[in-house]
Amino acid sequence: SVGFKAGVKDYRLTYYTPDYETKDTDILAAFRVTPQPGVPAEEAGAAVAAESSTGTWTTVWTDGLTSLDRYKGRCYHIEAVVGEENQYIAYVAYPLDLFEEGSVTNMFTSIVGNVFGFKALRALRLEDLRIPPSYSKTFQGPPHGIQVERDKLNKYGRPLLGCTIKPKLGLSAKNYGRAVYECLRGGLDFTKDDENVNSQPFMRWRDRFLFCAEAIYKAQAETGEIKGHYLNATAGTCEEMIKRAVFARELGVPIVMHDYLTGGFTANTSLAHYCRDNGLLLHIHRAMHAVIDRQKNHGMHFRVLAKALRMSGGDHIHAGTVVGKLEGEREMTLGFVDLLRDDYIEKDRSRGIFFTQDWVSMPGVLPVASGGIHVWHMPALTEIFGDDSVLQFGGGTLGHPWGNAPGAVANRVALEACVQARNEGRDLAREGNEIIPEACNWSPELAAACE
């Protein structure tokens, strides 16, 4: 008689444990599970726990060489999703030992690496993760964080202003630098490389870095403010990426940029470590996020990618705009904006926050609002995002009838007007449509932008 019995067995016998008390050191996950017809919810939830931790489809004799109880993921709670048929939220607890310290890459390989192709599930979405302090403390996190960034830039009490240089592809390095200079001179704090500007035949990275640095220094000299341009260091290899970051540091510029999903978490964490060691700020673009987070029933919610970025490291990250979207979306967006900026975030299902998250003083990340916003949105953006944010107007700056610099002036005037109005106790949501026209009286550039 053999000591174990091979053969396919129900996952729920081992991995569904409704009595389990979660530990402070567990990583907790909330999955939205859509089982195939005929598969019970408990079995589907247990299957997720098994396939993303120790399980395989059958009993193997080597199971006897380890303590399964110590290492297995456990589905400890299942609830039906209100308003959806055959959708469940399955809560899974993973023991800390399953994960390599300081590796977002390993965390994702474990939790979402294999289980999403699982046959018994029609669809699967990771909605949220609770990262325990015992795990988050193994990460450096953002290179600098919000407070250090404000001190470096000497800019307080207002959101920061940015602009993506367009047309994003096709400009020569010199003309690109000229566009950067115009925007910074006009009053923006930052300009930005587009996410797909890396090092193409029409503009190699080194030439762009040089002309942008020249633009930054010229604009700083004229305005007396510290300026920056997000120099995109994303490259085909980690070595090349670091080489570009080193060159940016040698030029003395304040900030570089990375596409963290296309570049990958390993590359991103390497760059974040370099940035902290060398005093560079790190701007993160989320290119490719919609591939992962757009489907409501499959993939990962962006709040998970945002938490992962805070652990891997970045000082800014794009976070949608909220303006003009649906109400529910607004609450969800503000939920993960808080997860990026705050130290301690209470569980709040109405904002999509499934777990209380304690970051224990890991530096925060500035959310970047960008995409289709213009000066009329300024009061709403100032109110919704508050001071700790970067507001990015691409076409909203460069589309100004008089050119880039006046477009930048218009944005800066609108922002300062909104901040002043707010500080005087006015209600931006209600009076926004009066505040901007009032400011137009003092600024022909803003008046032209509003027409």
UniProtKB/Swiss-Prot annotation:
Active site: 166, 285
EC number: 4.1.1.39
Entry-annotated residues carrying N6,N6,N6-trimethyllysine: 5
PROSITE patterns to which the protein is assigned, alphabetical: RUBISCO_LARGE
Main function: RuBisCO catalyzes two reactions: the carboxylation of D-ribulose 1,5-bisphosphate, the primary event in carbon dioxide fixation, as well as the oxidative fragmentation of the pentose substrate in the photorespiration process. Both reactions occur simultaneously and in competition at the same active site.
HAMAP family associated with the record: RuBisCO_L_type1 (MF_01338)
Family membership noted in the UniProt record: Belongs to the RuBisCO large chain family. Type I subfamily.
Protein's name in the database: Ribulose bisphosphate carboxylase large chain
Gene name for this UniProt entry: rbcL
